[in-house]
Amino acid sequence: WSWFWYYATGKAQATVEGWRAREAKAGRIYACGSESFGGFPFRFEMNCAAASASFQSNQQPVEIKARNILVAAQVYQPTLLLSEFHGPLTVATPGQAPDLVVNWKLFQSSVRGTPSAPERVSLVLDKPVLDSVTNGNARTLLRANHIEIHGRLAEGSVLSQPVIEVALRLDGALAPDLHPATAQPVDAKIDTVLRGLNDFAPKPWHERFRQIQAAGGRIDVTQARVQQGETIAVGSGSVSINPSGRLQGQLRVTIAGLEPFLKRIGAQQIVQTSPTVDKLAGALDRLSPGLGNVARQQVGANLTAGINMIGEQTTLEGQRAVTLPLRFDDGRTFLGPIPLGD
């Protein structure tokens, strides 16, 4: 048995080196400051200290570093790779100080399949924090209690017309500077299907988006549930990428607790200062000075009632709710008539 284990470990080392050599030819360089193999008798383990990944083929070269990565597989289940990452993880232009720093309490991944033909990939993070760093000053972009991302090859293969199912789970996630809607903790369960890829070879995301658009691909949101405080939303629909590389499409969304959500995002001010209301207020002011401002106030004060009249009345999880379209129009987002931003 020991002979078999050492033989298999040697084959694993050769496989890793062969994979690194192939990736290096494409400008993707993976390295360890030091590495060791172990796990005898029932596991194969590779420990990579001072791990780094350098992507030289990107339009803007990127270097990613992590303190330590442990990869393991059971002898009796060699096509299931389990990994544990130790931070911090940094993202930087090669030779420069980090632009992004990620820390976490626990970060694990699993990959089922082979390196050339993965079937399922899962990422699980406890207490992740993503910081942007400028001139040594850190600003939190994202933090959460728990994040899970699961991907599965539903159709095709990684080399030909793959259709990818992606499931996202968020617990207590917030992005303070992204948008007023994400400044408070969010719990979410979102299941999607990505169609339109030619293959899943590593490439910059802008190239991948162009590929999806050219193939008439889309993202199907098969089911989604998002909760923030007393606001609950569920929905489904499809979104595509237009020739400008922006999102285009619509989800049908049912929302309970709409009014607190509108207050959080400042919907009243958004509507009162929209170009349409500006034109109306200007015309009314020409008829009677001050009338335009009265109209603005009425529009804002009656916003929730107006949306409830436009939307379809229903119930959601025992609460009064309204169903509205969540539209993506050339990258702009609208909840019913309310612009949410780009």
Located regions from the model:
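N-terminal beta-strand/beta-hairpin edge segment
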Residues: 25-157, 224, 235
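Flexible, membrane-facing loop/turn or short amphipathic-helix motifs
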Residues: 52-62, 89-100, 127-142, 172-183, ...
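Membrane-interface amphipathic/juxtamembrane segments adjacent to transmembrane helices
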Residues: 16-28
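N-terminal type II signal-anchor transmembrane helix
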Residues: 1-17
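Gly/Pro-enriched, hydrophobic low-complexity segments
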Residues: 161-167, 174, 183
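Short, hydrophobic/aromatic-rich segments at coil-to-beta transitions
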Residues: 119-122, 162-167, 216-223
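Extended terminal
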Residues: 33, 208-218, 224-226, 231, ...
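Extended lipid/amphipathic-ligand handling interfaces
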Residues: 35-37, 66-76, 102-116, 139, ...
